[in-house]
């Protein structure tokens, strides 16, 4: 029984699904997808639970969310292992994901009050009050790269705001989704407030096409995000928050500390085996001897990175990709760029055929035409050389995406120029592209999102504002508008 609908664990009636470890092929989870009828049942349960949940005092909703945080802390080791085994990422990184989930609770509570709490301004004849109301029933689509943390970033603020939810994890990480939902169950969520439906494309389409949804919160690829945007077009009454991918540039100017620049680049491009939406995909390096030295050192150090199993000791910097198919896709993208005329600086290599272990690849594409503007979700870094900083910014903006952008430079004026001219939601200076502050919004423009950033701003798309002018007494104004006559006429 792998679906949780209206407080009950039930068996899916759709396609049979099996999840294996992407490196060892060990079977981790088996179950059946939710069919369309079960997806509709989950929506009905959420709709029925909404009136009571939204009328609960905020303190009551907060107490359940904080109980969930305590359960995450108590089961940190267990959830860490589930995430690591299911995604293939090393244990150390999976542990940081669970820590981020725990920290998200307090941050979301603060963000609720700061962004969508109640504010009152006293007027001479009453008060002006701003309140926020939940949308109702929301669908949450989770990704596979951070199967605990990223859905958590939608679920927690949505529940705090008073919404009820249907959660569909990625079909590649059903075990993590189920494990997290069991902690919510233990936290005491009332039946129907949060429902779990497992499945792939058919389940997702059944969920997103429900007429009774009030909105959809999505983290994933641009292609799926665009499909959802088209599907919900003509329905302005539904909130749609899309957090999609990026083809992110990292600009390397002349720097004295080459090793520090190489370290920042490795953290930007290859952490999580390149499976972060903010990962650097395009490396823009200034022409000249210093740029040459930087690239040589980058190839040297990156060439020593050896992906390993989630539980290897000592721990590797990177583990496997989410699947052997994902690793193959990266290899095909590299070969495609070679065929276009790219010059391989570091060839990616499958560590073991049939597994998702893949070493990093680096390819130079300066002057190469028709390079696809796409997000290759894995450890493949494309390099361009530039002559001057204006050209670097032009190259950086030469993408339909707009998630993250970074600069490695000691020149503050260059960063100020980048802030003015970069088209990206995240612009970092001498910091990895993959670093983000939880007290700031997280999201992008263009093909990276629809102007609904998450993290600190997630509260914004989980509730709508309600403005009120109010007074406890009804009085006739001392001064009336022109043309109004309230004089008493004597009866004839």
Swiss-Prot record:
Alphabetized PROSITE patterns for the sequence: ALDEHYDE_DEHYDR_CYS, ALDEHYDE_DEHYDR_GLU
CDD domains: ALDH_SGSD_AstD (cd07095)
Classification via SUPFAM superfamilies: ALDH-like
Taxonomy, superkingdom: Bacteria
Residues that hold NAD(+) according to the record: 220-225
A Pfam family hit: Aldedh
One of the record's GO molecular function terms: succinylglutamate-semialdehyde dehydrogenase activity
NAD listed as a keyword: yes
EC number(s) reported in the record: 1.2.1.71
Record: active site: 243, 277
Catalytic reactions of this protein: N-succinyl-L-glutamate 5-semialdehyde + NAD(+) + H2O = N-succinyl-L-glutamate + NADH + 2 H(+)
Record keywords: Arginine metabolism, NAD, Oxidoreductase
Pathway(s): Amino-acid degradation; L-arginine degradation via AST pathway; L-glutamate and succinate from L-arginine: step 4/5
Name of the top EC class for this enzyme: oxidoreductase
GO BP terms in the entry: arginine catabolic process to glutamate; arginine catabolic process to succinate
Record-linked InterPro entries: Ald_DH/histidinol_DH, Ald_DH_C, Ald_DH_CS_CYS, Ald_DH_CS_GLU, Ald_DH_N, Aldehyde_DH_dom, SuccinylGlu_semiald_DH_AstD
Function: Catalyzes the NAD-dependent reduction of succinylglutamate semialdehyde into succinylglutamate.
UniProt similarity note: Belongs to the aldehyde dehydrogenase family. AstD subfamily.
Protein name as it appears in the record: N-succinylglutamate 5-semialdehyde dehydrogenase
């Amino acid at each position: 029984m792998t679906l949780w609908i209206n407080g009950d664990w039930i068996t899916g009636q759709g396609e049979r699904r099996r999840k294996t470890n992407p490196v060892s092929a060990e079977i981790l989870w088996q179950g059946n997808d939710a069919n369309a009828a079960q997806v509709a049942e989950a929506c009905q349960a959420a709709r029925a639970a909404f009136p009571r949940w939204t009328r609960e005092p905020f303190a009551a909703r907060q107490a359940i969310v904080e109980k969930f945080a305590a359960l995450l802390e108590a089961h940190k080791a267990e959830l860490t292992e589930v995430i690591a085994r299911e995604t293939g990422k090393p244990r150390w990184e999976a542990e940081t994901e669970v820590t981020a989930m725990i920290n998200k609770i307090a941050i979301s509570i603060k963000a609720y009050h700061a962004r969508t709490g109640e504010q009152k301004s006293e007027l001479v004849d009453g008060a002006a009050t701003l309140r926020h109301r939940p949308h109702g029933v929301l669908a949450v689509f989770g990704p596979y790269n951070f199967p605990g943390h990223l859905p958590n970033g939608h679920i927690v603020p949505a529940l705090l705001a008073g919404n009820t939810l249907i959660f569909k994890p990625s079909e590649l990480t059903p075990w993590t989704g189920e494990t997290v939902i069991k902690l919510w169950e233990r936290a005491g969520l009332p039946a129907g407030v949060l429902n779990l439906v497992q499945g792939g494309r058919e389940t997702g389409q059944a969920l997103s096409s429900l007429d009774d949804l009030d909105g959809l919160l999505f983290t994933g690829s641009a292609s799926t995000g665009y499909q959802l945007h088209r599907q919900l077009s003509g329905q302005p009454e539904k909130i749609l928050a899309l957090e999609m991918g990026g083809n992110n540039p990292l600009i390397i100017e002349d720097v004295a500390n080459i090793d520090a620049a190489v370290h920042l680049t490795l953290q930007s491009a290859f952490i999580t085996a390149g499976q972060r939406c903010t990962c650097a995909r395009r490396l823009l390096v200034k022409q000249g001897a210093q740029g040459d030295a930087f690239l040589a050192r980058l190839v040297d150090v990156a060439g020593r990175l050896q992906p390993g199993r989630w539980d290897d000791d000592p721990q590797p910097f990177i583990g496997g990709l989410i699947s052997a198919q994902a690793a193959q896709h990266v290899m095909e993208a590299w070969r495609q760029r070679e065929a276009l005329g790219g010059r391989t600086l570091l060839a990616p290599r499958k560590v073991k055929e049939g597994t998702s272990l893949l070493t990093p690849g680096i390819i130079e594409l300066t002057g190469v035409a028709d390079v696809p503007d796409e997000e290759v979700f894995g450890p493949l870094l494309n390099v361009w050389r530039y002559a001057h900083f204006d050209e670097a910014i032009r190259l950086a903006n030469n993408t339909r995406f707009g998630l993250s952008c970074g600069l490695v430079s000691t020149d503050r004026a260059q960063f100020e120029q980048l802030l003015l001219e970069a088209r990206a939601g995240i612009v970092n200076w001498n910091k990895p592209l993959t670093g983000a502050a939880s007290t700031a919004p997280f999201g992008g423009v263009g093909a990276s999102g629809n102007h609904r950033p998450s993290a600190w701003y997630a509260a914004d798309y989980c509730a709508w504002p309600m403005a009120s002018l109010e007074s406890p007494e009804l009085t006739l104004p001392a001064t009336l508008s022109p043309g109004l006559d309230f004089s008493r006429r004597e009866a004839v």
